[in-house]
């Protein structure tokens, strides 16, 4: 008797089906991961802005309204990101446009799903605390912005 060598057609079809199922699960998960990584870049870009705003608030002893060009505001000295100096994933990052010291980061619409992150400072008892909020899909933003 001759011993069978190699794989039968049904065995190959089963292996291909298993690979297809794994790919169907892995590709969407990887896509979500890459978007989250890009949105995290926006939070990283805002960290230097947060440091400058926190120092200004502590020096003034209060939140002071105004933009980076307004003398004495909480945003003085902040390096904003505009369309002219945007990064691959961060479209804009502004300070003080909505309220005193507030930082709004807008992500690229195609690569980072247009996520928006708003960082709002509060000053109490000599300490500055930050609250991160978003109107974007929660699965794309860092955990500290999901609450």
From Swiss-Prot:
Gene Ontology cellular component terms for the protein in this record: cell outer membrane; periplasmic space; pilus; plasma membrane
Matches recorded under SUPFAM superfamilies: Pili subunits
Keyword presence, Ubl conjugation: no
Name of a matching Pfam family: N_methyl
Principal cellular location given in the protein's record: membrane
Propeptide: 1-6
Coiled-coil portions: none
GO biological process: cell adhesion; establishment of competence for transformation
Entry GO MF terms: DNA binding
Keywords from the named record: Cell inner membrane, Cell membrane, Cell outer membrane, Competence, DNA-binding, Glycoprotein, Membrane, Methylation, Periplasm
Source domain of life: Bacteria
PROSITE patterns given in the database record: PROKAR_NTER_METHYL (PS00409)
Gene deletion effect: A deletion of comP completely abolishes natural transformation, due to a complete lack of DNA binding and, therefore, uptake of DNA, but has no effect on piliation and on twitching motility.
Cell inner membrane listed as a keyword: yes
Induction context: Is maximally expressed in the late stationary growth phase (at protein and mRNA level). Minimal comP expression levels are detected in the middle of the logarithmic growth phase.
Compartments where located: Cell inner membrane; Periplasm; Cell outer membrane
Residue(s) carrying N-methylphenylalanine: 7
PTM info: Glycosylated by PglL2. The 20-kDa form is glycosylated; a 23-kDa form also exists, that might be due to a further modification. The glycosylation of ComP is not required for its function in DNA binding and uptake.
Purpose: Pilin-like competence factor, which is essential for natural transformation of the Gram-negative soil bacterium A.baylyi ADP1. Is not a subunit of the pilus structures. Likely functions as a major subunit of an oligomeric structure acting as a channel or pore mediating DNA translocation through the outer membrane and periplasm.
Similarity comment: Belongs to the N-Me-Phe pilin family.
Protein name: Pilin-like competence factor ComP
The species this protein was found in: Acinetobacter baylyi (strain ATCC 33305 / BD413 / ADP1)
Lineage of the organism: Bacteria, Pseudomonadati, Pseudomonadota, Gammaproteobacteria, Moraxellales
């Amino acid at each position: 008797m001759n011993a069978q060598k190699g794989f039968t057609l049904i065995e190959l079809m089963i292996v291909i089906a298993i690979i297809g199922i794994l790919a169907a699960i892995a590709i969407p998960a990887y896509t979500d991961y890459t978007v989250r990584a890009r949105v995290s870049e926006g939070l990283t870009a805002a960290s230097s802005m947060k440091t400058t705003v926190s120092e200004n608030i502590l020096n003034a002893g209060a939140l002071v309204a105004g933009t980076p060009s307004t003398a004495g505001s909480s945003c003085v000295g902040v390096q904003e990101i505009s369309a002219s100096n945007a990064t691959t994933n961060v479209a804009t990052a502004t300070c003080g446009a909505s309220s005193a010291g507030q930082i709004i980061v807008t992500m690229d619409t195609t690569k980072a799903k247009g996520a928006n992150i708003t960082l709002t400072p509060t000053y109490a008892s000599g300490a500055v605390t930050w609250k991160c909020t978003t109107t974007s899909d929660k699965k794309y933003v860092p955990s500290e912005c999901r609450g």
